[in-house]
Amino acid sequence: MSFFNISRRFYSQIVKKSVKIKRMSVEDIKKARAAVPFNREQLESVLRGRFFYAPAFDLYGGVSGLYDYGPPGCAFQNNIIDAWRKHFILEEDMLEVDCTMLTPYEVLKTSGHVDKFSDWMCRDLKTGEIFRADHLVEEVLEARLKGDQEARGLVEDANAAAKDDAEKKKRKKKVKQIKAVKLDDDVVKEYEEILAKIDGYSGPELGELMEKYDIGNPVTGETLESPRAFNLMFETAIGPSGQLKGYLRPETAQGQFLNFNKLLEFNNSKTPFASASIGKSFRNEISPRAGLLRVREFLMAEIEHFVDPLDKSHPKFNEIKDIKLSFLPRDVQEAGSTEPIVKTVGEAVASRMVDNETLGYFIARIYQFLMKIGVDESKLRFRQHMANEMAHYAADCWDGELKTSYGWIECVGCADRSAYDLTVHSKKTKEKLVVRQKLDNPIEVTKWEIDLTKKLFGPKFRKDAPKVESHLLNMSQDDLASKAELLKANGKFTIKVDGVDGEVELDDKLVKIEQRTKVEHVREYVPSVIEPSFGIGRIIYSVFEHSFWNRPEDNARSVLSFPPLVAPTKVLLVPLSNHKDLVPVTTEVAKILRKSQIPFKIDDSGVSIGKRYARNDELGTPFGVTIDFESAKDHSVTLRERDSTKQVRGSVENVIKAIRDITYNGASWEEGTKDLTPFIAQAEAEAETD
């Protein structure tokens, strides 16, 4: 009997045993994922064991909020960024820029970040321990609700649950003993309403909650100082003199705004248009926690869509208007509820729950992107910011929030920044950041205008004359109208000018303000900005959780069910053994995969195929290609699908085509493998003829 016949018989015996393994349908997979409860510790063990990421500077004890990505984590992040770039930049014809991370003080002072980019912190005056106020209130009230549940007999041991939760969250502080105390129903309702709105409280309001509900140091019970603002930006000095103060950027947006005129010119002065930027940003978090979810250095992908403030329609809105999403609008939250409303995007915009078509369009596109990269649709909602929760620059904002074992996490923001940024930078630099639209039909426009008697400015205001003049020439129409009334009534008015001490008085000899009607052939306006902003690290971690499950037949066998598009490695190439006759085929298949630019790994270790597949299931590798002794004979290989463990067989060329179609062309497993032969049936037939 020839070597190949012996090998064939040997392989068939292996396959006969493998026939007993259940091949799973899509429904089977869903049931299997639901059958085994999610275990965060097990996920983190897999992620760190397979070096998706690890604490930075671990040998030196690490630094809270800083992480390094290993090879699979780096590849996964790159694949998500590549998908993002194609989904947004290429599809929407956006203009990509890469701006510096170092930002001068004046830029961020003008944008409002120096004064307003803060979280609320409170300090234990005895120990010096610092807490983030909203997190502290949330943690204490949640603990009291758990104690109430134990007192009512709804849970067996609230302390065990709390300790388990603290361990999972890797908190270094101890968990104060939770007392099983039954709360009044009204108090329970109050706590639940507070927790539903926890992101919307100001510092003074958090202080009032801490005082009202006797919230102090959760370990010692000591009273804490009142919450105070802590600016989250990392300060630095630019240059050797140390005179030029700067910051590591807290967002990529400012670089895009400051390059607006160049971008508009590059786009042949056509609007609307969008710029985009992908890069690192930095925030000096008060209490980094929850792994990749709250860190001090993170990757962002941001879009600035510049649009006419009088026309926020979108030409492609009809393409997405029928998409149904879960919305959590402001009024629902104000009522103390967290139950989302399911509506189509078209209905949300028509009812003005979502302000305009462009904002609605990008919310829908965010949804489509998140679905593409592996987010669980049932764990996605769009929550509207409360009025006092919005960033200082935002007119409206919706967060794409993903549910994880840590709760609902803000991963994407979609804000209408109105014309705030361009307006403040234009006012500060005296450089117009506007769109000039040629009008088909000239229009008559009546405006307030101010005339200055400049020859009197120098003697009266001396060195401050340029500042006063600049302030007057940049006054809004409303300001000019009010000053005109004062000038008419009193013959004078006063103003406050940046950089000038006290109030500046001007009379009718120095200025004249009147309405004038002109015919305009060009409309000049500051565009509004719709900004989708993605926290890539938070999205990555959420996809980790949404993709993780254990096989019901063996809970120790973990799987990361990444979509093939974003999986770090697409193919595990598995020679059946280290026999020299399999080397040429393995080399040939590797060469074709490399030429096809399909990321792969060869595992020719001596362990069983099952173990090799299992450890790559933990890496999220969607396909396994097995090279056996039949492959050496007829150049056919077996293709295995990760989640269902289904296997098919065909020529090397057809198998690689199937991998490419499923990974990059959006084909399903059934569509991609329709020309391949189910492996088990073939193997059984072979076994019977031997």
UniProtKB/Swiss-Prot annotation:
Question: What terms describe the molecular function in GO for this protein?
Answer: ATP binding; ATP:ATP adenylyltransferase activity; glycine-tRNA ligase activity; protein dimerization activity; sequence-specific mRNA binding
**List-wise, which residues carry Phosphoserine?**
226, 476, 528
- Keyword Plastid included in the entry's annotation: no
Residues found modified as N-acetylserine: 25
* InterPro entries on file: aa-tRNA-synth_II, aa-tRNA-synth_II/BPL/LPL, Anticodon-bd, Anticodon-bd_dom_sf, Gly-tRNA_synthase/POLG2, GlyRS-like_core, tRNA-synt_gly
Which key words tag this protein in UniProt? Acetylation, Aminoacyl-tRNA synthetase, ATP-binding, Cytoplasm, Ligase, Mitochondrion, Nucleotide-binding, Phosphoprotein, Protein biosynthesis, Transferase, Transit peptide
Q: Where are residues bearing Phosphothreonine located in the sequence?
A: 689
Q: Which CDD domains does the entry link to?
A: GlyRS-like_core, GlyRS_anticodon
* Reaction it catalyzes: tRNA(Gly) + glycine + ATP = glycyl-tRNA(Gly) + AMP + diphosphate; 2 ATP + H(+) = P(1),P(4)-bis(5'-adenosyl) tetraphosphate + diphosphate
Note the coiled coil stretches, chain numbering.
none
Q: Which residues bind glycine?
A: 251, 302, 531-533
Q: Name one GO cellular component term.
A: mitochondrial matrix
Which residues of the sequence carry a binding annotation for ATP?
283-285, 294-295, 410-411, 538
Q: What are the boundaries of the transit peptide?
A: 1-24
Q: Oligomeric state and partners?
A: Homodimer.
The task this protein performs is described as: Catalyzes the ATP-dependent ligation of glycine to the 3'-end of its cognate tRNA, via the formation of an aminoacyl-adenylate intermediate (Gly-AMP). Also produces diadenosine tetraphosphate (Ap4A), a universal pleiotropic signaling molecule needed for cell regulation pathways, by direct condensation of 2 ATPs. Thereby, may play a special role in Ap4A homeostasis.
Q: To which protein family does this belong?
A: Belongs to the class-II aminoacyl-tRNA synthetase family.
Q: Provide the protein name.
A: Glycine--tRNA ligase 1, mitochondrial
Organism for this UniProt entry: Saccharomyces cerevisiae (strain ATCC 204508 / S288c) (Baker's yeast)
Query: Which gene codes for it?
Result: GRS1
